[in-house]
Amino acid sequence: MNSKLEIAKLEPVWNTNKSIFYLMSSIVFLLFALPLFNVNSFYLHLMITIFMYSAMSQSWNVIAGMSGQISLGHGAFFGLGAYSSTFLYMEYDITPWAGIVVGIFLSGIVAILIGLSVLRLSGHYFAIATLLIGISFQVIFQRWDLVGAASGLWVPLTEFDSWNAMQFHSSKVPYYYIFLVFFLITFFLIWLLDRSKIGFRFRAVRDDPQAAASLGINVSKHKIIAYAISAMIMAPMGSLFAQYILIIDPDRVFSFDISIFVLLLTVLGGVGNIWGPLVGTVILIPVTEYSRIWFGGTGGAVDLMIYGIILMIICVFRPAGIISLVPARILERDKKR
């Protein structure tokens, strides 16, 4: 662990595998070019959903994969982001772009306050505490008349497409680019965090808290920082989701299902690896969307059965996730100057 901390001090953050860099640059170029090929709205919606859940899974991976704390109530920050931007736009005509920023800071503050009380717990106790916190947020918003209680909030519709109001009625393409940019920003920030000194300290705390403390790392402080960063990444996805569907309610945006699904995506792809959440999302989101087409409604629970089968196979044969199928040397940073 000490050697890891030394590496974090000596190696440039920007040092990365050149092959991975060229591959990712090509993929990003293709993603930006995709709408130019007149892709139908379903595939745009599919990509939007992938971008959103990839960013959400990266958020959960910070607290679980980097710092080793399993959160079962992470959907609370998704809901806070959704309600922050929507409420400010409805009541004060504040653009959702500003509402996103408010949601990010609000989620960060709430995460710090929660962290001060529950991050002294660990293992199952922390997981149960976060589960109860997530449920508490849902119950509070169901009974809070100021934010619509159980009925939720409807985003006021604009007559025409508006970037200021983040509403586009004629096409999903603007939404596609907005979600894509936010996803890329999220991935880039996580990529930097993963290679930074604080990222190595997170992993030191995860691997051996006592040894980390003996090296001068404030364990509680770094757990709280990881929790706050994780929450601040989750919040803007809630804000964007609210603008995309134009209606939110506590059962939709504070749902326990959100927390579990994000956990599932990350575990499937590979916890603790920045590529894991992306891999898990790219595999499972199409399963969800196509099962709804083939079986109607919510997919007739077929998608849940498929998730269960895939998860059991992964847990038995690849406990480190699907990303472990990729040779480690391909994902390592290129240390050659």
Question: Which residue ranges define each predicted feature?
Answer:
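Transmembrane alpha-helices and adjacent helix-loop boundaries
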Residues: M1-R337
